[in-house]
A protein has these predicted regions:
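Signature of short aromatic-glycine-proline-rich micro-motifs recurring in repeat-based ectodomains
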Residues: 19-33
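Beta-rich catalytic cores
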Residues: 27, 49, 72
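Functional-site microenvironments in short loops/helix caps that host divalent-cation chemistry
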Residues: 474, 479, 525-537, 542-705, ...
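Surface-exposed loop and turn segments in beta-propeller and other repeat-based domains
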Residues: 2-21, 71-73
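Aromatic- and Gly/Pro-enriched helix-to-coil junctions and flexible linker segments
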Residues: 70, 80-83, 92, 115-120, ...
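Residue position within the beta-strands of beta-propeller blades
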Residues: 39-42
Length: 727
């Protein structure tokens, strides 16, 4: 806001709040500027006044032009006599039931900035079906942290090599588009929709391009072909429902172990739980316990989030613990590609449960028969008839006919997924002189004449370094799939390592345009973008491997030293600082509160409620549903999200936050242990990320744990630290 009119001298306080102007007078609607100083506007000057047309100026004058008793005048439009303008020929074909969409280059625009060409293989097209009049609908209408509306997957369409696409969609239907990678996971989310008129050609330059962008003067592959028809999903177009889409995946792959007979999450179907929002509400919902047990392992934006354009892959499936566990190898389970694609779609659609509207006629004042009436009117006036209830029923029948619904047979093999167990025991690895205690670690480090150094970025911004001596150790372990088998690793030369993760202040000293942004809240009615992750002393995040290396290159040019990311071998050696345990301070069962910022009891405050959301009360009946992030409840590290670096105790070599706060990029390619494979550099796509973060539990934050991301990804909980080898 630049200035409020009237009240030109009243200071502007930037407040974001639902019902901000409730009880505030005068109230205004639909201002129409006459020139720089005068405006026609609909105004209600007081609670008991009429809505009328007023002339408002920059001199604080409010002059009534017209009002009418019993009426509200709300649309001031000045008219002037003029010649009839040229008639623009119609761009629609009223009898058509389709529209055409043309995307010139999906890699153009802020939404896919930095995504390498060739990454996007297809587009997922889905349609929204909105709620009914006075029927129960809210941000939890479709699930926990899911959304308001039904999402119907219409199909997919390939993207051409040059990034172009030309395809048909149903006319008069609100559709949304998601660009997919080779695995079928969305790289970006379109958080709005478009609607094509019958016969219309809808076009855009790219993905969330600037509104002032003009088409690029080039011929595209798609424009030289016929518009493609959508490839409809197997089983037909239908709303995405947990019970019919995801539960069969759990039945085939998970319930042989996750069956309620142990401490693991129970993924069996038909274990129903009642969800009731608020003491006075009459709306009771039923959720499968399997849904409530699975969705906490999915990272997603929820019904509302920061309105800033999302970084590409912000909510990519690889950011979800569920997918990382499965990709790393979970107790020998190899989930078929078809089932993985189903999980990706579930995540990309915000992890819904219902995919339907329930209890439509619950409220006494709700019009009856709305479902049929909507179809009748939609068909009459737009030629579209969406019977989402029938689509769900038809798909359920299709599942039964194809023996995919009950987990009795597998999706493609005719059997439940086989769990592959190790065929032979793995021998323990021993390294002479390892492990060693804190006293020995300190002594090894002290053998260097000087153990601390400082790199200067600007006169006011520095990076502190500490010396890490050479040595040998047991790298990895034989318990974690991604970190096995354990093997002897050698760090032949000592090196200098930054004592902390690179901070926002340090990174912005060289890349001032970078913004680590915010961590989103759950619930809705947000009054801020979220919890700040961009304060000066917090570790930089949403920074790609490529950008981390660019930072190292600039520091090298400034200092004259060779600055780089550590290899994962250097990183683990430094993190262990002599320890063979999960952490330098103990095991995954240890109290980490004084040592690392991990997922602890403070994360309960991520469960919020209300207008201007605040943490839920401990006795709130909804808290058990919304306090879902996996955590260690008996530890308190006193930090909700990432915190200023060096807030906890350092390890014996003076390194802070190695296992927590945020995870860290390394220089290494993600190849199997024991790292002897001569990797084809072009074939290795991902880079290794080490350590854990504020939203991860100890077992996923150990010194041995490995994660992997594409070098252009900018995860919200990954940063980096640097090493220098030749100071």
């Amino acid at each position: 806001m630049i200035q409020e009119l009237p009240f030109k001298d009243r200071p502007i306080v930037p407040i974001i709040k639902d019902e901000l102007v409730e009880g505030v007078w005068p109230q205004f609607m639909k201002p129409f500027p006459l020139n720089e100083k005068y405006f026609l506007v609909a105004c209600k000057p007081a609670k008991d006044a009429l809505w009328g047309i007023y002339l408002v100026d920059v001199f604080d004058n409010l002059t009534l032009i017209a009002e009418q008793e019993g009426e509200g005048l709300t649309a001031p439009i000045p008219l002037v006599k003029r010649e009839t303008p040229p008639v623009i020929p119609s761009k629609i074909k009223p009898d058509s039931k389709e529209a055409t969409v043309f995307i010139q280059d999906i890699y153009e625009g802020e939404g896919t900035q930095g995504v390498p060409r060739g990454t996007i293989k297809a587009l997922r097209i889905f349609a929204y079906e909105y709620a009914y009049i006075l029927a129960p609908s809210d941000h939890d209408a479709q699930g926990i942290q899911s959304g308001w509306d039904i999402k119907r997957i219409l199909g997919t369409v390939p993207v051409e090599e040059d990034g172009s696409a030309l395809f048909t969609i149903p006319a008069n239907t609100p559709i949304s588009i998601q660009p997919l990678d080779k695995d079928g996971a969305a790289i970006q989310w379109m958080r709005s929709w478009l609607t094509g008129m019958p016969g219309e050609i809808v076009s855009c330059v790219g993905c969330h391009e600037d509104q002032n962008s003009i088409p690029i003067p080039k011929r595209t592959i798609a424009s030289a072909k016929q518009a493609r028809r959508l490839e409809t999903p197997e089983g037909g177009v239908r709303p995405f429902t947990f019970r019919l889409e995801v539960q069969p995946v759990l039945d085939r792959n998970c319930v042989s172990c996750h069956n309620g007979k142990n401490a693991e999450p129970d993924f069996r179907k038909d274990q129903m739980v009642t969800y009731k929002r608020g003491i006075l509400t009459k709306i009771n919902k039923q959720y499968d316990q399997s849904y409530l047990n699975l969705h906490p392992y999915v990272y997603r934006q929820g019904p509302e989030s920061d309105i800033y354009v999302l970084k590409p892959a912000e909510f990519h499936a690889s950011n979800s613990e569920l997918i990382r566990i499965l990709q790393a190898g979970h107790h020998g389970v190899e989930v078929p590609e078809e089932d993985m694609r189903t999980l990706y779609a579930w995540i990309d659609l915000n992890a819904p449960y219902y995919g339907a509207f329930t209890q439509i006629d619950l409220k006494p004042q709700s019009p009856k028969g709305q479902v049929e009436r909507r179809m009748e009117l939609a068909e009459k006036y737009s030629g579209v008839r969406v019977d989402w209830q029938k689509e769900i029923a038809d798909y359920a029948d299709w599942l039964k006919e194809n023996k995919k619904a009950d987990g009795i047979t597998g999706a493609t093999t005719g059997e439940t997924v086989e769990i592959k167990k190790p065929t032979k025991p793995v021998r323990p690895v021993k390294v002479k002189g390892f492990p060693f205690d804190t006293q020995t670690a300190t002594a090894r480090q002290a053998a260097k004449d000087e153990t601390t150094r400082r790199l200067t970025i600007t006169p006011d911004v520095h990076i502190d370094l500490v010396w890490i001596p050479a040595g040998s150790f047991v790298m990895g372990n034989n318990r974690t799939p991604s970190a096995s088998p354990a093997f002897k690793a050698n760090v032949k030369e000592g090196f200098w390592m930054s004592t902390t993760e690179i901070t926002n202040e340090q990174f912005r000293a060289l890349f001032p345009e970078h913004d680590s942004r915010y961590i989103g809240q759950t619930w809705k009615d947000h009054t801020t973008p979220g919890y700040a992750a961009n304060r000066p002393k917090q570790p930089v995040v949403r920074v790609s491997w490529d950008e981390a290396n660019a930072f190292c290159q600039k520091i090298s040019e400034i200092s004259g030293n060779t600055v780089s990311l550590p290899t994962e071998t250097q990183w683990e050696w430094a993190a262990r600082s002599g320890s063979a345990d999960d952490f330098w301070f103990g095991s995954t069962e240890s109290d980490f509160g004084a040592f690392e910022n991990l997922a602890d009891s403070t994360t309960v405050d991520l469960a919020v409620t209300g207008v201007d959301p605040k943490p839920m009360r401990a006795n709130d009946p909804m808290r058990k549903f919304w306090d879902f992030l996996p955590k260690i409840l008996n530890v308190n590290d006193h930090q909700l999200i990432s915190c200023p670096v060096a807030s906890y105790q350092p390890n014996p070599w003076g390194l802070y936050d190695m296992n927590g706060n945020v995870a860290e990029w390394t220089a290494s390619d993600y190849i199997p242990y024991p790292l002897k494979e001569k990797a084809n550099k072009e074939a290795v796509e991902k880079k290794v990320v080490r350590g854990g973060s504020w939203r991860e539990r100890p077992k996923y934050s150990t010194s041995a744990i490995r994660k992997a991301y594409l070098p252009w990804q900018r995860p919200m909980n990954v940063g980096f630290r640097i090493i220098v080898e030749d100071m």
